């Protein structure tokens, strides 16, 4: 009997856990290069994506083997030696399964990515790329129909948007700008601006507008984050300069 991975949650963690698959010639060449080939057989499975791939060395364990004496007909007569296999390590994640499911439900029919992090520890609580896929289909080789359905889908379910997608950071960058301003003494918590709803560069009449027409009025550092005040950070960016911003 042989054991295979089963992914009972299917799409829920597909882009986090990834999947295993049949070992390929390319995998074998990489294992040989890393001096790990002796621990694998040509019929083994190996991590192909996600954490399955990243932690393959820790999860795989040690392959066992038997040395058997056979007769002229190839039938086993006796076992000369046996080395039992050693199970791989158990990997525990910080992902909150309920939060993960809630995040996926919130996306509904829409595509997108979401990563939720515990600020105090840096632990990843949710890691979502929508839509997902069924990793069970890849374990023993995905069939042509399912592969074409995934590959040709306009929703690109095999694309890990949370990991490989390139998106403008938008307002998620504002708290980091605020921390940089405090560290560089460019702003104090009590520093306040009067926001008319736009910002003009020195010597220019062009209006760089805030998301809220008419502005937010009096805005200090704390309020600038709470209401996501664009004009506050336009001015801060000018005062800090590109080199200081890039260092953060």
Enumerate the predicted regions with their spans:
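Conserved catalytic neighborhood of penicillin-recognizing serine enzymes
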Residues: 89-90, 157-162, 188-190, 194-246
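Short acidic, glycine/serine/threonine-rich loops at helix termini
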Residues: 126-129, 204
């Amino acid at each position: 009997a042989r054991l295979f991975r089963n992914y009972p949650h299917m799409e829920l963690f597909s882009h986090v856990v990834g999947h295993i698959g049949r070992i390929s010639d390319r995998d074998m060449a990489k294992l040989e290069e890393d001096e790990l080939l002796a621990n694998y057989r040509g019929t083994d499975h190996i991590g192909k994506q996600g954490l399955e791939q990243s932690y393959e060395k820790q999860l795989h364990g040690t392959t066992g083997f038997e040395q058997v004496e056979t007769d002229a007909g190839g039938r086993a007569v006796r076992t000369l030696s046996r080395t039992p296999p050693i199970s791989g390590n158990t990997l525990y994640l910080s992902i909150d399964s309920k939060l993960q499911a809630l995040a996926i439900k919130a996306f509904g029919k829409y595509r997108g990515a979401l990563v939720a992090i515990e600020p105090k520890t840096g632990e990843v609580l949710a890691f979502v790329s929508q839509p997902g896929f069924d990793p069970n289909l890849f374990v023993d080789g995905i069939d042509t129909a399912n592969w074409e359905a995934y590959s040709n889908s306009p929703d690109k379910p095999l694309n890990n948007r949370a990991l490989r997608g390139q998106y403008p950071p938008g307002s998620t960058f504002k708290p980091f700008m605020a921390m940089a301003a405090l560290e560089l003494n460019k702003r104090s918590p009590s520093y306040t601006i009067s926001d008319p709803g736009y910002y003009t560069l020195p010597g220019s009449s062009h209006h760089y507008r805030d998301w809220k027409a008419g502005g937010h009025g009096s805005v200090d550092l704390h309020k600038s984050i709470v209401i996501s005040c664009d004009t506050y950070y336009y001015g801060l960016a000018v005062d800090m300069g590109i080199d200081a911003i890039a260092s953060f």
